[in-house]
């Protein structure tokens, strides 16, 4: 994602003749810095592509509050987006484009190919260890095929291989940092307390690193944290 999001942001801006000041996520600064080095090698004039590595409250705020910045494009959390929009409005009313996290459910109907549906939903949730703004973490299944879908989903989750992502055959690596690791574990606990049924996973995988077992709940209340 660091490389993809950088391309999505740089491409349109540069194609329209703009210069870019890009702040990377503090967890993944190296990709953007390397791309900037390649851009320099390719002959981009100095000052056209500018990369800032830092934290949101300092480096990010400097961009969103700056009077000479005409447009801000932000990908991240809804909470941070509020801060970005407020800073943009209070400074020079700069335009803002946002790509934020969502929790839209996937829907499986009774006439679906269940094996295909299970594989699709599995990928939709666990892709990139669930660290995706459109991760399908909720699934609504029509009543007639609910039990079979749940059974197949649990079987697939239990087969998912967890470990070093640089090892061949491994499907799931660690979460990116302590904050994400703790957030997921906290949501698992909230799921248990809500009355949802924990069918597999639900705890740390191994004794080191930010690994979490592939986790599946069923009978999730609609008003619970993990169900809403």
Swiss-Prot record:
EC numbers for this chain: 1.2.1.3
Molecular function in Gene Ontology: aldehyde dehydrogenase (NAD+) activity
GO annotation, biological process: ethanol catabolic process
Protein name: Aldehyde dehydrogenase 9
Protein family per UniProt: Belongs to the aldehyde dehydrogenase family.
Binding site for NAD(+): 76-81
Keywords noted in UniProt: NAD, Oxidoreductase
Active site: 99, 132
Pathway participation: Alcohol metabolism; ethanol degradation; acetate from ethanol: step 2/2
Catalytic activity: an aldehyde + NAD(+) + H2O = a carboxylate + NADH + 2 H(+)
UniProt superkingdom: Eukaryota
Family matches, as InterPro entries: Ald_DH/histidinol_DH, Ald_DH_C, Ald_DH_CS_CYS, Ald_DH_CS_GLU, Ald_DH_N, Aldehyde_DH_dom
Enzyme kind, highest EC tier: oxidoreductase
């Amino acid at each position: 994602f660091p490389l993809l999001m950088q391309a999505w942001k740089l491409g349109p801006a540069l194609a329209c003749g703009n210069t870019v000041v890009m702040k990377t996520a503090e967890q993944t600064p190296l990709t953007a810095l390397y791309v900037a080095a390649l851009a320099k090698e390719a002959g981009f004039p100095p000052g056209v592509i500018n990369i800032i590595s830092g934290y949101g409250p300092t480096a990010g705020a400097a961009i969103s509050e700056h009077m000479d910045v005409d447009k801000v494009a932000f990908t991240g959390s809804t909470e941070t987006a509020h801060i970005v929009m407020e800073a943009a409005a209070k400074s020079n009313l700069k335009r803002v484009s946002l790509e934020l996290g969502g929790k839209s459910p996937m829907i499986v109907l009774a006439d679906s190919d269940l094996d295909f549906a299970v594989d699709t939903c599995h990928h939709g949730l666990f892709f990139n260890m669930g660290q995706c703004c459109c991760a399908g973490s909720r699934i609504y299944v029509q009543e007639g095929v609910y039990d079979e879908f749940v059974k197949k989903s649990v079987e697939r989750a239990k087969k998912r291989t967890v470990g070093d992502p640089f090892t061949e055959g491994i499907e799931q690596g660690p979460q990116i940092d302590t904050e994400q690791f703790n957030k997921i574990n906290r949501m698992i606990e909230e799921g248990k307390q809500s009355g949802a049924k924990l069918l597999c996973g639900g705890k740390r995988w191994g004794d080191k690193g930010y690994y979490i077992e592939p986790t599946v709940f069923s009978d999730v209340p609609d008003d619970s944290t993990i169900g809403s």
